[in-house]
């Protein structure tokens, strides 16, 4: 049986909830899952963008919520009867040095990644299928921090991976895994770097073994692999084109 056939057999007819699914990796995973016959609901912070993403790509539904607010998540998910697979990747690019940046700004790294995940899981409760899965999206900063104001973001990314491992035990027999992507060319990169994006990407490419950034579609395919592989549990999958080696 081929890989695509296995994914199709596993995901067809399933309900997939993607928190942070209106662009980039989340939207790529959503559209690919839909192509395999899944019913996909995306959650975003902006109602207009969430609605547009769902309608443009023929997804089953959308919700808008501030993921850092427990009551907002509860309200957004209240009418969803059942979820087979949950993907958690909401989070802005929170940058700022510990001794210089506003503390409330830095706190968002954990609120958007760790606490948002906890609020979502508690809101769903037993509506998350017993034979389902949860997939976190962290990032290479979790084990490759730098000196450019990413210490708190790196800590939040590492916390997501640790949380996922613990949840693989707490939520069993549900499977819980993390995808840890390296440099991926997504809208978030442009938002974070602004006018410096092109120069940064060009310099980064020269340092990478494959001389390019990964695509949202490649990362989305890895998300589907983690959903569909029934023996993958408590794992962190590094998808970085070898960038951790240099």
Residue ranges and their predicted role:
Residues 56-71:
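Rossmann-fold cofactor-recognition segment
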Residues 97-98, 105-107, 200, 204:
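Substrate-binding pocket helix/loop in short-chain dehydrogenase/reductase
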Residues 212-239, 244:
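C-terminal substrate-recognition "lid" of short-chain dehydrogenase/reductases
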Residues 184-207:
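A glycine/serine/threonine-rich, flexible loop-to-helix segment
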Residues 109-110, 118-119, 131-172, 183:
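Catalytic loop of short-chain dehydrogenase/reductase
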Residues 87-96, 241-242:
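Conserved NAD(P)H cofactor-binding loop of Rossmann-fold oxidoreductase domains
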Residues 22-23:
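Conserved glycine-rich cofactor-binding loop
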């Amino acid at each position: 049986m081929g890989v695509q056939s296995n994914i199709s057999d596993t995901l067809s007819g399933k309900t997939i909830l993607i928190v942070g699914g209106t662009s980039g990796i989340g939207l790529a995973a959503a559209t690919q899952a839909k192509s395999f016959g899944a019913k996909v609901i995306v959650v975003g912070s902006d109602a207009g963008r969430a609605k547009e993403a769902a309608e443009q790509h023929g997804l089953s539904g959308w919700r808008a919520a501030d993921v850092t607010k427990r009551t907002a998540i509860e309200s957004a998910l209240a009418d969803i009867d059942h979820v087979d697979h949950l993907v958690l990747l909401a989070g802005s690019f929170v940058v700022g040095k510990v001794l210089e940046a506003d503390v409330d700004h830095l706190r968002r790294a954990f609120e958007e990644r760790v606490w948002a995940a906890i609020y979502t899981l508690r809101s769903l409760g037993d509506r998350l299928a017993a034979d389902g899965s949860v997939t976190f999206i962290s990032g290479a900063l979790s084990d490759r921090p730098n000196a450019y104001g990413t210490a708190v973001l790196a800590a939040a990314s590492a916390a997501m991976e640790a949380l996922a491992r613990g949840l693989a035990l707490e939520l069993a027999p549900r499977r819980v895994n993390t995808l840890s992507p390296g440099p991926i060319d997504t809208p978030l990169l442009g938002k974070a770097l602004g006018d410096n994006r092109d120069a940064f990407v060009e310099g980064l490419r020269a340092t990478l073994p494959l001389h390019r950034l990964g695509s949202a579609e490649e990362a989305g395919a890895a998300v589907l692999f983690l959903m569909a592989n029934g023996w993958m549990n408590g794992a962190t999958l590094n998808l970085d084109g070898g960038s951790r080696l240099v």
